[in-house]
């Protein structure tokens, strides 16, 4: 294969290292021909698609810096606003942002449709609306990128976000007459813990998996296994400094230790840790409790207009000199303001 440049070369190397075929990696999110062009650096970059491809490879995008057009940057900002309002339990405002998202020309694309539907499912669940409504939104979200979910699970080529959707479906369905099998969640949890996720991706999903597996393993059946998974989740959360799931994992760990009649002083330390986290959430007027689909991602974005302006100024160039023989000064001004 010829030497490639840019993001395509990175994706090719990562895919080859994991032993994943192109067809497996792009199923449900891109045509095979489009993905092949991406690897060959012959396709315009779709930032949201790159996010998901990297996720399916088990890799984090937190170390990538994107230079974005303003319209793409606004979508990322819109997603953040939706999640912030959900954390603040401001349902109506979150719905308004989702309605705004729906009006975007890209809203019908699978990755965007999935985000909109999963957030509507999350809001409905947190608000205590009908389980049927939650499931309706959730199934629509899943189908966007996992049209063959069972076959895709067999390959293990799913992202943390996609695995969370499958876990959430199992949890929600436990409140209906169509409860999903215990064997399904046991298999899902094993798949998740086996997958070669980077630490920053692993922490997004294994705490949720640890919480759900404790619901299906009966008392005395295999408490050692639950304890092991809970400790792995707690360690991951502490190592990455994440709050999502932390109070619930601490609560689960405390119950396990109490049943074992473990050191009372250590249990009290865990209680105080949990209390402090909940106080921080209260002080900042947010709540992560039961917010299963929150995407806690730290990203570096550069808006292309801002980058042009900053680079021009660093080079001590005027708009007039930079635009000479290229465009009018007025056109460059509009570009730098994000209006061109």
What is the predicted function of each stretch?
Residues 1-17, 290-314:
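A short, Lys/Arg-rich alpha-helix, primarily the initiator
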Residues 18-37, 315-333:
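Short alpha-helical DNA-recognition segment
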Residues 48-63, 340:
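DNA major-groove recognition helix of helix-turn-helix/homeodomain DNA-binding modules
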Residues 58-74:
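Short C-terminal boundary/hinge segments that cap the last helix of small helical domains
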Residues 66-67, 101-113, 127, 143-160, ...:
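Flexible helix-coil transition and linker loops at the boundaries of alpha-helical arrays
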Residues 74-127:
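Helix-turn-helix/homeodomain-like alpha-helical modules used for DNA recognition
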Residues 80, 112-123, 161-171, 207-214, ...:
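"A position-specific structural signal for the A-helix of alpha-solenoid helical repeats
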Residues 86-100, 126-148, 175-192, 220-232, ...:
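Helix-turn-helix repeat elements of alpha-solenoid scaffolds
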């Amino acid at each position: 294969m010829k030497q490639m440049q840019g993001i395509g070369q990175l994706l090719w190397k990562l895919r080859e290292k994991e032993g994943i075929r192109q067809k497996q990696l792009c199923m449900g999110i891109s045509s095979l021909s489009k993905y092949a062009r991406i690897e060959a650096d012959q396709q315009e970059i779709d930032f949201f698609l790159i996010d998901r491809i990297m996720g399916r490879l088990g890799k984090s995008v937190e170390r990538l810096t994107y230079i974005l057009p303003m319209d793409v940057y606004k979508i990322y900002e819109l997603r953040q606003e939706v999640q912030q309002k959900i954390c603040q339990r401001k349902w109506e405002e979150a719905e308004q942002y989702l309605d705004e998202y729906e009006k975007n020309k890209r809203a019908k694309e699978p990755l965007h449709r999935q985000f909109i539907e999963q957030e509507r499912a999350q809001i409905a669940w947190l608000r205590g609306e009908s389980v049927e409504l939650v499931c309706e939104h959730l199934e629509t979200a899943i189908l966007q990128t996992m049209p063959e979910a069972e076959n895709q699970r067999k390959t293990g080529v799913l992202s943390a976000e996609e695995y969370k959707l499958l876990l959430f479906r199992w949890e929600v369905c436990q409140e209906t007459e169509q409860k999903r099998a215990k064997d399904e969640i046991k298999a899902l949890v094993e798949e998740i813990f086996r997958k070669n996720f980077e630490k920053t991706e692993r922490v997004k999903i294994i705490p949720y998996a640890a919480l759900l597996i404790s619901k299906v393993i009966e008392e005395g059946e295999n408490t050692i296994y639950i304890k092991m998974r809970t400790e792995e989740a707690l360690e991951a959360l502490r190592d990455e400094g994440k709050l999502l799931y932390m109070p619930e994992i601490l609560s689960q760990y405390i119950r396990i230790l109490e049943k074992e009649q473990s050191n009372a002083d250590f249990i009290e330390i865990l209680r105080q840790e949990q209390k402090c986290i909940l106080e921080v959430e209260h002080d900042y007027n947010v709540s992560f409790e039961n917010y299963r689909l929150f995407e806690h991602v730290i990203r570096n974005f550069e808006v292309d207009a801002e980058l042009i302006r900053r680079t021009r100024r660093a080079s001590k160039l005027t708009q007039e000199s930079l635009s000479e023989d290229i465009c009018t000064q007025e056109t460059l001004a509009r570009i730098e303001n994000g209006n061109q």
